[in-house]
Design a protein with these regions (language model features):
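Acidic, serine/proline-rich low-complexity intrinsically disordered regions
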Residues: 124-125, 135-361
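Type-3 copper protein
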Residues: 1-236
Length: 361
């Protein structure tokens, strides 16, 4: 309360922060700030301040129409996630069969299954991601060839869309978060007037896979209508979800600012390693109380109340971590040209070199 009351008064804010840290250390006998390392979340102090710009940007139909080439990109991204999920699920089947054979039981305890899957999630699944991406890029190379020495390559949305539909057929959603795609799109124009005249280009910065950026705590907490975001989440997921609880520390260096908070009362949490949810929250399940069985040849998780979910949902965070930055249309090379589909730059021009190749180095 004292920190909040200090507002923009720098001197009062420093005093309030110092007092808070002193109280925390006295009560917990723990340092109020943590040292930065590979396993420490970005936010290492007790409190932080988030702000929202007062400016509001609105875009019209002209800009939205120019975003149409995102559609075939997203179609191919869905294929990419589906293939990755299918590969990991097949590895999960092998783990299940091994544990089931060893115990002589059709039901395998989820806690045992999770720990037996560790070599897959941090080994085989990484290889799967690399191989699936390589195939993804081979298919895109046939859709948009990159002539050697060219600085600019152009293609039309209609031509690309028809080829993408053939090269990347629909696949089932592999895990619940794989419904989401979060593109970062920049507008390149001299000024707002130029945009109105249609004199602009769009640039795809990144296309994040299996992640709803708007679900991050820092966005939800500052959104004018968080309830609306939860309502829309219900449209994306008409039924309950099974969400793995994240450990207190994670090598991905997650923080309270970016954790997904669009979680509804009907969603289930499963504690795989640490129980980091509200201990009084309903629908929080310990992995030791759940089981893995096969349904129509596919592994599913059965919760104590009888609810069932694809086993890939248990791996959801690991799969999202693998997939989030996978989207790359063309492999790295000494030179990759700028590739445009209509008004959208889908791949920016890039160069790769070593220091020894540079005359001034």
């Amino acid at each position: 309360e004292r920190v909040e009351a200090a507002g923009r008064d720098a001197e009062a804010l420093c005093e309030a922060l110092a007092a808070l840290e002193e109280d925390f250390t006295r009560i917990t006998d723990t340092a109020s700030q943590r040292a930065k390392d590979s396993g420490t979340a970005p936010n290492r102090s007790l409190v932080h301040s988030d702000t929202r710009r007062s400016a509001t940007a609105r875009i019209g139909g002209t800009v939205l129409d120019a975003m149409a080439p995102l559609d075939p990109l997203m179609t191919s991204a869905a294929w990419l996630m589906g293939r990755l999920g299918a590969r990991v699920e097949q590895r999960a089947v092998e783990v299940y069969e091994k544990l089931s054979a060893a115990s002589g039981e059709e039901r395998v305890n989820l806690a045992d299954f999770w720990f037996a899957s560790m070599p897959i999630l941090h080994g085989g699944a990484v290889t799967d991601a690399q191989e699936v991406l390589a195939e993804f890029q081979r298919r895109w190379a046939r859709i948009i060839p990159l002539p050697e020495g060219e600085a600019r390559v152009r293609a039309s949305h209609s031509a690309v869309a028809s080829q993408v539909a053939e090269a990347f057929p629909p696949v089932p959603v592999a895990w619940s978060a794989a419904r989401y795609l979060s593109p970062d799109v920049l507008i390149a124009a001299r000024d707002t007037g130029a945009i109105g005249r249609g004199d602009f280009e769009l640039v795809l910065g990144e296309l994040h896979l299996a992640s709803n950026t708007m679900g991050a705590s820092l966005f939800v907490s500052q959104h004018p209508e968080p309830a609306e975001l939860l309502r829309l989440t219900g449209r994306d997921h008409p039924g309950p979800r099974l969400l793995p609880l994240l450990p207190k520390e994670h090598k991905a260096r997650l923080s309270t600012r970016v954790r997904n908070v669009l979680v509804r009362p009907e969603d289930y949490y499963v504690a795989l390693m640490e129980l980091t949810a509200d201990p009084h929250r309903d629908r929080t399940v310990l992995s030791a109380d759940a089981h893995v069985v096969r349904r129509d040849g596919r592994p599913v998780v059965v919760l104590p109340g009888g609810a069932e979910f694809p086993v890939t949902d248990v791996f959801g965070h690991v799969l999202t971590t693998l997939a989030m930055d996978m989207f790359q249309l063309f492999p790295d090379a000494d030179h990759v040209p700028r590739v445009m589909v209509d008004k959208l730059v889908v791949s920016r021009e890039s160069w790769r070199f070593t220091g020894g190749e540079l005359g001034f180095a």
